[in-house]
Structures are given as structure tokens and as C-alpha cells.
Amino acid sequence: MSGFPRSVVVGGSGAVGGMFAGLLREAGSRTLVVDLVPPPGRPDACLVGDVTAPGPELAAALRDADLVLLAVHEDVALKAVAPVTRLMRPGALLADTLSVRTGMAAELAAHAPGVQHVGLNPMFAPAAGMTGRPVAAVVTRDGPGVTALLRLVEGGGGRPVRLTAEEHDRTTAATQALTHAVILSFGLALARLGVDVRALAATAPPPHQVLLALLARVLGGSPEVYGDIQRSNPRAASARRALAEALRSFAALIGDDPDRAEDPDRADDPDRTDNPGHPGGCDGAGNLDGVFEELRRLMGPELAAGQDHCQELFRTLHRTDDEGEKDR
């Protein structure tokens, strides 16, 4: 048994809500899916209702529920906190799947300080499956319901990782907002270079193949979802600024002049200050020594594990047991 004889999943017709609804049902919970619109061709698959203004049938379900899980957009979830928690019985658990935590923490403090609550943010696409994958868990108010739900996630193969609301938003600004910005900026740079992607794919060393694959994966997703991640996290703008500043620092380190457009015909011009032979030139390799040392310290004990992971990834790309590409 799931620990939740009766559960309500709001937004359960969507990918994330559907994943949790399935997990609850498999564990024996009587799970009611609530949505504004039923899935196409399945008018009886859910209770149609507005969780921000519950009608009589939805209100009754919320009163009886041992768990109410909000798998909806942040705006809807925040508006739902007050009306939903007023209906929930003592001891019931409120959960949500928001990708930003600080707003929900403030809303709960204002309207439902005594309600058990945990936020679950699956750090993967639901289609990939939960087995072995991390689920960020932010506990606002602990209790038996929180323990039961985290145990249910573990039983479904997930790996709950506990974070505070502040830690969550700071971490996901790097793991999601920064990562997506890097990948899409890489694609924009390719477009500006005017390169033939077919030629790239045919000649690319493993690191470039991985970046092309990541770009292709992101482009297979929803622009709305990726845009929402960039806009909703209060720390995402800082992550993008850090990326832009890091690229400017790297360019300066190598010897680029940001005020002068690159001219391929001047590559060997002895008067260029970024020419290694110029008295004021820049020895990029020498300057990179310090960068490499700094980043090796940043990686710490994860450096060796990351190198092993990358080697395994490259082997998978080439379907071989011996991958010799190391520096390119």
C-alpha cells in the first residue's frame, strides 16, 4: 500500500502528473485525476475542475484525500494553496512538482503553515522513466506523509535528493537554466558561423558529437517549457550573466579583441596584438594553465568520476571498447 488510500493528482493528464498518478495507482492508492480539460478521446479519464476555485465534487474529493499533489504551472499552484489547504483534513499531505521552490515556500508560510508539504521536482523528462534518476525533494513541513511519499518515490526507482528551497533554486539555476543556455547558445553560435551541420556530424570528434546530440535533444522539446525554466527561476538571470562573463573572460584570456571583428585574412598579421609573435601577444596555453587548475579544484573528487563517465560515454558513441580521443 502507498500510505495514501485516497489521493488527488491535479494536472494528472500531463506528463509529470501522469507519472505520479501511475506510481500511486500501482501502489494501491485510489487516485483521482483532476484537470481543466480531459485527455483527447477520454472524457471520463479525469474530473474536470478548477483547483483554484473548487466546485462541490472537487471540494469533496479534496476533503477525503490523504494526498493532494499539484502537478500544474507555478501560477496555478500558488493560487491553489489557500483554497486547497482550507479543505484538506488534518494530517493530509500537500505535494507539488514545481521547478521553482521559493515562491511556494512563501505561499505556504502565509496560508498553510501547519500543513505537511513536500515539493518534488523530477530532474528528468517523464518519458525517460524514474528508475535511477534524481528527484529533488524540498520539505517545507515534515511528517509521516512526507516520509511515505519519499518512500513511494524510492520504491518506484527514483532517487530523492533533499534540498532546502534556496538550495534547490540555486542548484537548478545551474543544472537546468545554465545548462540549457549553454546548449542553445552553442546552436546559435553554429548558425552564426554558417557551418554545414552535415559536415560537422561527419567529422566531429566525440566532445562535439555530444554537444550536437544535446542540441538535438533540446530542440525536440517544447520552447515554452525551456523558456519557462529560464524565466521562472529567480537565479536564472545570474546564471546567464555568469555564462556571458565567463565567455568574455575566456576570449580575453586567449587574446581576442572584443572591439574588433575577426578577419580571417589577418590571421597571420604580425601587427595583431593577439598574435603569439607580437610583443604584447597572449600565450593562450600558458594562461589556460591557471584556468585548468582552478576548474580542477572546483570539480574536486568528482573530477575522476566525471572523466570515467565521459570515457564511457565516448565508448558508447563509437561502439568500441577503446576510446583514444582525449584532448579534442
From Swiss-Prot:
Similarity annotation: Belongs to the prephenate/arogenate dehydrogenase family.
Keywords on record: Antibiotic biosynthesis, Oxidoreductase
Root EC class: oxidoreductase
Originating species: Streptomyces venezuelae (strain ATCC 10712 / CBS 650.69 / DSM 40230 / JCM 4526 / NBRC 13096 / PD 04745)
A GO term for molecular function: prephenate dehydrogenase (NAD+) activity
Residue span of region Disordered: 254-288
Functional note: Involved in chloramphenicol biosynthesis. Probably catalyzes the formation of 3-(4-aminophenyl)pyruvate from 4-amino-4-deoxyprephenate.
Name of the molecule in the record: 4-amino-4-deoxyprephenate dehydrogenase
Residues annotated as domain Prephenate/arogenate dehydrogenase: 6-284
Basic and acidic residues bias (residue ranges): 257-275
Pathway: Antibiotic biosynthesis
Null allele phenotype: Disruption of the gene causes severe decrease in chloramphenicol production.
E.C. number(s) listed in UniProt: 1.3.1.121
UniProt cross-references to Pfam families, sorted A to Z: PDH_C (PF20463)
GO biological process entries: antibiotic biosynthetic process; tyrosine biosynthetic process
Catalytic activity: 4-amino-4-deoxyprephenate + NAD(+) = 3-(4-aminophenyl)pyruvate + CO2 + NADH + H(+)
